[in-house]
Amino acid sequence: MSGAPSPADRGATAEHKRSGEIRGGIRVMIVDDSLTVRTIFKRMVESDRQMVVTGTASSAERAIVQLKGAPADVVLLDLEMPGMGGLEALPQILATSDDVQVLVVSSLTQDGAEHTLAALSTGAADTMLKPRPGGFNEDYRSQLLGKIRALGRDTAEAIGLEAEIAPAGGPARKGPRPGERLLRGKRPEVLAVGASTGGIHALNLMLRALTPEFDLPILVTQHLPSSFMPVFARQIEIASGRRTHIADDGTPIRPGEIAIATGHGHMMVERRGDDLVARVCADPMPSGCLPSVDPMLSSLAEACEGRVLAVILSGMGRDGAEGAAALHRAGGTIYAQDAETSAVWGMPGAVAKADLATLIAPPEMLAEAIMALVPAPLAR
């Protein structure tokens, strides 16, 4: 329900503004219709001296009003609230600042998963499951603060690093290096995509920009809870206009289709005769991620002898860097999302810093380059 902030909200905002002036740090807004949840999140955030709560709101309408007067770096957003609701309010929240990042705090229900994935596709950067009663423990606090810390860091350093990687006086690389066009003379068999925090929005933008004529199989490893994967697959199918499925052990990799890594195992690929098939492995990886991008790219490097085009989108950490290095050694080509459009320039930044990325660009430009790099199907 719309209206002026309640006395409690106004008092909290004034208090947090004074606190922000003293402490500085990552500015956090908490939006949830539950007073209990708002109070718990406030205590957790304020336990970190690098963060300050600039406001709390019991509705999306109140949050939008407060954000216009007290901008935040990170907004913790509940989607299921009376009135406007978090999903409907998301575009307006994102419009309050060019730099604001939204962390969706979602429920474990089917509706909660669908709304969360819709929010991530619209521009929310990351998600965190809201625990059941008694679940707001130290582990949860550590995970929450880690996500806020990653999202709230100033991107200026990342953008500056990207500028150093780019040619002097020019933008980030806008095309293949000399001699690398068509993957050093070989048509790729697969387009492989790795993504994490902020990657779903970027993935949607990139897939929508690929024309129907693009016929390569598309493999996607996205860091998400396994319970979200069926909803994620359905939403990707709608956004891309391509048949999309979760890759089980032994699933054939088919042209023009999208295969998504299951949330409880890594998607790997092996060759059986002339065909490629998916394998599922749950072995621990150095990145600690499940699913991990590294085994997908490393297995493709071997199965396709380097005939792979890989794209690393927005994400926290370094997952994908080792696999990208293996793929590059085998003759494959790697693209990376740029820092300015990434929610977190961790995964693409790691690839760029290692000088593995032929192209560093926004998602739509990556799609253009993919279609320019991959020729029409060869006559058989």
Where are the regions that the model predicts?
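Conserved acid/base catalytic micro-environments in cytosolic active-site loops
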Residues: 2-30, 34-50, 56, 61-62, ...
